[in-house]
Amino acid sequence: AWSIPVKGVRFYEALFEKKTLSKMGWVSTPVTIETTDSLYLAIHEANLTDYAAMNLKPVEQVEDNKTVTLRAALTPWSTGEKVRVTDTRVSPWRTMIVAESAGDLLLSRLMLNLNEPCRITDTSWIQPMRYIGIWWTYHMKHNTWHAGPHHGATTENTMRHIDFAAANNLGGVLVEGWNEDWATWKFSFTKPYTDFDIQRITDYGRSKGVALIGHHETGGNVSNYENQMEDGFKFYEKYGVHQVKTGYVGDLLDGKEYHSSQFGVLHYRKVIEAAARHRICIDNHEPVIPTGLQRTFPNLMTQEGVRGQEWDAWDVDGGNPPSHTVILPFTRGLAGPMDFTPVTFRFVNDVMPQTRVHTTLAKQLALFVVLYSPLQMASDEIENYEANPEPFNFIVSCPTDWSRTVVPEACIGSYVTIARCDKGEGCWYIGSITGDEERTANISLSFLDTDKRYLATIYRDAPEADYETCPAAILIEEREVTYSDTLTIRQARSGGTAVRLCPIKDS
């Protein structure tokens, strides 16, 4: 079974551990299980509303038949109660996906369908997006969130990012560090720093067709945020900001409550509903684990709740290992859209040499497809994209929401290949990634239309590519293919392949 522990882990940001059920401790869900008779199970919950999140504990083992009993363990309030109820209450659904292959787990819509139908009448303002941001530069220590000589969120720097986004068909620019007061973490959500002219920025962005993506870091101070939340959303609505990333960095909410407690669940729901009233989409960081609420409130576009790419910038243990991203689709990915923030083109951090990105460049491109998020960030500093325009062309063209998904091959912890079809042009995009070992991917194209020819643009590891010794080595090639073809491609250690397949129009 693959799971992450509850104790000692903040915001679900941990590496998934592979253990037998009998050796598994108190863990968060989803828990993914491979049985001895080659079935795949995933235990989670759906429609978590005004309740505490479910964790699992093994409580009994019968040695004779190797039976292990798992029991639900709810995240408590600081006072010890699990759930506070004054009237009747409907508990969340307890879910189990049962699949005959690892890939079939990824195609289940069970959790989503157990949530209530959409409550937003007009959803035309809710749109998927590729975006960049003033963010990775902080992790590289090139800029600061707080005001000063190296402040990142300035008018000029934001406009420079808007220019890059406009030139590369990217929909938005996330700006963190725009508001007072990052020096003390007593945040205002309506007062920009003096060097951040939001009127000028949003006017400029509109002229270029690029949105400003807002940011509300709360530091876990829920009371301060709820006192300002309506004004903060009104402020953004006034300037035409329709996407906001929220953050809750801090071990506890209001200094005492767990993020996944009933207190946290109620707060996050309040934020999502308030945002919807102001036509604002939410990217929720440090969340309670997703359970399908995006069906009811589709303005909940994506959430973190994962040990993402940022850990490669500063983790004292060295960063995410190669196997991490070939486990995530079968675990955290089953809970819903995941803001992992991929597409890092520079693999080291000069000020923290003990850590690095443990992938090849081709794998970074493939992650844009493999890890689903309708709001999908290309996280690196734009200078690194400007230095590598040809690989970045894959990101420029790649959608972030899809009409169909297939999984040609998958083995949890070793490799996964996911193909997704766009919602208009009939183009397919493939992301194929591997873990610790070099391998040869055999990607059947049988999902393509049988009566069409396709131009395949393939971004793959060069022969010398290796995530440790030569991560940036990449080859880009084109070939004509049909549904009867199979792509046979070598992948380096922690390598990958990204493919764009577009129908060839007869002249």
Label the model's feature ranges.
Residues A1-R119:
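N-terminal accessory beta-strand-rich subdomains and adjacent acidic, glycine-rich linkers
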Residues K7, I458-S484:
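Solvent-exposed beta-strand/loop surfaces of large extracellular or lumenal domains
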Residues A165, I282, V370, I430, ...:
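Conserved, mostly hydrophobic/aromatic
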Residues I412-Y454, T497-R500:
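Carbohydrate-binding surface patches
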Residues E478-S507:
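C-terminal beta-strand-rich structural cap/linker in extracellular carbohydrate-active enzymes
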